[in-house]
Amino acid sequence: MAEIAAQLVSVERPLWVGTATSVTAQTTEGEIGVLPGHEPLLGQLVENGVVTIRTNTGEKLVAAVQGGFLSVSSEKITILADSATWASEVNVADAESRKQSAETEHDKAVAESELRAVKRMEA
């Protein structure tokens, strides 16, 4: 299967660098799937979106992202997120509680994004 270098980086920390067979992200233009050999592009990630990376080892990595950009070149896919949390790091009970008690729409949306990432990871 074809492979491409990829990385997911947030303002807080680098999350992952490796080789991927596909990347799926939610952009302001809609959900996009990127495979090796894809035409170059630059996309804006939606607030409260989900990014899925399929690694060359078959692993499925899923993260909740809060805005940022997706850059695709012939050599690499780069996801630059304002904020990102791995679905595997999400405490579902805590996220549900934060969603219910959120005082702002932003806080509620962040919790919802984390819960969507967990569901996508389990799918």
From Swiss-Prot:
Pfam families xref list: ATP-synt_DE_N
Region (Disordered): 96-123
Topology relative to the membrane: Peripheral membrane protein
GO cellular component term of the entry, any: plasma membrane
GO molecular function, one term: proton-transporting ATP synthase activity, rotational mechanism
The keyword Ribonucleoprotein belongs to this UniProt entry's keyword annotation: no
SUPFAM superfamilies listed in its UniProt record: Epsilon subunit of F1F0-ATP synthase N-terminal domain (SSF51344)
Location in or out of the cell: Cell membrane
Biological role stated in the UniProt entry: Produces ATP from ADP in the presence of a proton gradient across the membrane.
NCBIfam families reported in the protein's UniProt record: ATP_synt_epsi (TIGR01216), PRK00571.2-5 (NF001852), PRK13442.1 (NF009977)
PANTHER family: ATP SYNTHASE DELTA/EPSILON CHAIN (PTHR13822), ATP SYNTHASE EPSILON CHAIN, CHLOROPLASTIC (PTHR13822:SF10)
The protein's assembly and partners: F-type ATPases have 2 components, CF(1) - the catalytic core - and CF(0) - the membrane proton channel. CF(1) has five subunits: alpha(3), beta(3), gamma(1), delta(1), epsilon(1). CF(0) has three main subunits: a, b and c.
Protein name in UniProt: ATP synthase epsilon chain
